[in-house]
Every structure is written in structure tokens, then in C-alpha cells.
Amino acid sequence: QIKRRRLEQGMQSLGSTRGAGGHGQNPFAALISPETDEDHGTVYAMNFVYSGNFLAGAEVDMHQNTRFQMGIHPFDFAWTVLPGERFQAPEAVMVYSGQGLGRMSRIFHKLYRDCLIPARFARRERPVLLNSWEANYFDFHKEGLVSLAGEAARVGAELFVLDDGWFGKRNDTTSSVGDWAPNEEKLGGTLPELIRDIEDKGIAFGLWFEPEMVSPDSDLYRAHPEWVIQVQGRRLEMSRDEYVLDLSNPEVCDYIIESIGRILGSCHIVYVKWDMNRNFTNMGSGYLSADRQKEQAHRYMLGLYRVMETLTGRFPEVLFESCAGGGGRCDPGMLYYMPQVWISDDTDAMERLRMQYGSSLIYPSLVMGCHISEVPNH
């Protein structure tokens, strides 16, 4: 939702140290004249082309001059630049409008469609999809999935998405994230066989992953407990029954590329929902040296971008949708790799209208994923 604050002397800011923008703040801010509306008023806006920790601020000094800034959040961040090296900071898009917020939005939309979103998706109409989550949660079997896909196709849906629960021993939130091997007993056969039966109903197939996380009860964690973000010698903090993998470690990134790539290369998957259901806590890396620990959060993002660069290059026709427990990671950095964003887990139709309107202030409506769901919303 759009929030306005009156500038006063001193510093006002918004930001995140969660490892992503978060649900309460997007890496966007604008200075506007008080009377600004959709069609009138002066706007100076910035949007950070980055998916990690950020800080945006406006400082009014004693002479009523305003300094407007945006960048990587300085909290717990440092970077060692050795002789001959350089550090490249993320960029911010700056937009001026003398014709209100509407003009600002149109500039952002055109720029992102023309220059940021992958060209093959920049103007492609998105498929109408049915996601299995609120229909089945973890409780499903092959016959039910195929039947649901058939009903979706009958009413005009073009894509059936199998959400959480298809891999490892995953029947609730407590296990198997990181073990990206299909549960053939639960699926009633191989994943390619399930996809074939669903496609026979006249509908395409998509799949859910949460590649940046790992369950304590998983083969991956048992093999590599050192791969998670953790303060050495301290108790690990869990959220949603999972830990965050340390993507500052190239081995972790290579594992994600290999395991997700193996699934995508084995069958006909046209869409991936890429989820991130928890934030960073207890930052620490077993891979980085003691004097480089404050580089971890940014190195994580560089690792994630390498993963996405590799996978989207290898599977250019797969539509990747960014999800972070809803819209917790919606930013231009993600849009470069994932041209669709799941705006919120709240799919109440009236509430969603407000969210879609707020998101459209910056991002084209083309990128916003939205479900039709039961009322009241789960």
C-alpha cells in the first residue's frame, strides 16, 4: 500500500536488513510536492536495482535543503577492496515527472519492459494458472492432481502449478527442503509421467521450488551442515522449520544450479515458482574468512544472481516467478531474471486490488501474478 510522509528537519528512512526488501518496504522512494496526484505535481523517484539489504533516506538540513539517497544498507556491511580491485555498487533508477505519479509510473513501466525484463517475456501475455496449494496443501495424489488439472483446463486455465510437497519425504513443513528429488510414491510414478498425464488434459505444467533454504531433516543438511548461514559456535535459529543456505559459498550455488537444473532438464516444465519463505538471521559464514564476514549478505546476492543467470540461460523459455512468502522480494534486480512476481499470499479479491494498484506505481501490471481463490481467503 502507498504511504506518504511529510518531510521534517532531520532524517527519515526506510530499509531492510532481512536479506530481501521485505513485505513492509519496497526498494522505492519518491520526493513529491504536497499536492501531487496521478496527473499533477512534481516527483523525484528512485528504485534500487538490487534484491538484498537496502536503505533509502531523505535528510532535511537546517537550511531546508533535502538530500535524497538510496543504496546497500550499511548495517553489518563492509567490503575489502585490495590494490587493483574495484567494488561495483548496485544501481538505482532515478525518474523525474512534472506531471504527477501517473507520468512517473509510465516511465518506470516503459523502461522495465524495454530494458530490464527479458525480451522474450517483456510483452508476452501471461498464462492463466491454477496453483495446487490452497486446494491440496501437502495432501495430494496423482489421480487428484490430474483431475484438478483437467477441471482447470475445462474452465480456461492454461497452466497447472504443483506447489510444495512433491519432493523428498515432504508431507509437512518439517522436512526435505533441499532434497530436490521427486517423491515417486506420492506422485504415483515419475515426474515426467505426471506431467504427460496433465498435459493430456490440455494444460501446461509448472513447479514450486525453494532453492535457497534447507530443512534440518534433509539429506542435504545431514551431508553439509556447514552450508547454512550461522554464527560459529552459536545455536542455529530456525524459521518455518528451515535454515538459509549460505549462497556466498560457490559450492552451495553450484549445488542449487545442478539440483534444480536436473529437474528442469528432465521433463517439460514451462514455469517455476521460486519461493523464499524466511529472512536472514544470525549472519555468519563458514566459508568466508573472519575479516570478510561483513561481505556475506552482498556476496549472497551475487551468488543468487549467478544461480539465476545460469538457470535462465540454460532454460530461457521457462517463466520464473519470484516469491518470498508472498511479495517479500519484488524489485528490479529480480525482474531481470524472473519476469513475474507473486505480489502477496493474501488473495482476497478486494485486498488484492489495493496491492496490485500500489505495486503498479512502479512495476508493469504484466509482471504481477495473481490467483483467484476461495472467499474468505485462506
Set out the residue ranges of the language-model regions.
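Short, glycine-/Ser/Thr-/acidic-enriched flexible segments
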Residues: 51, 94, 135, 212, ...
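Residue-level preference for nonpolar/small residues embedded in alpha-helices
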Residues: 76, 144, 190, 303-304
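Composition- and surface-driven signal marking solvent-exposed, interaction-prone regions
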Residues: 104-109, 145, 334-336
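Long, charged amphipathic helices and adjacent flexible linkers at domain junctions
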Residues: 108-128
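Aromatic-lined carbohydrate-binding/catalytic grooves of carbohydrate-active enzymes
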Residues: 121-257, 271
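Active-site and adjacent substrate-binding regions of carbohydrate-active enzymes
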Residues: 137, 164, 168, 175, ...
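Glycan-recognition surfaces
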Residues: 215-254, 258, 298-378
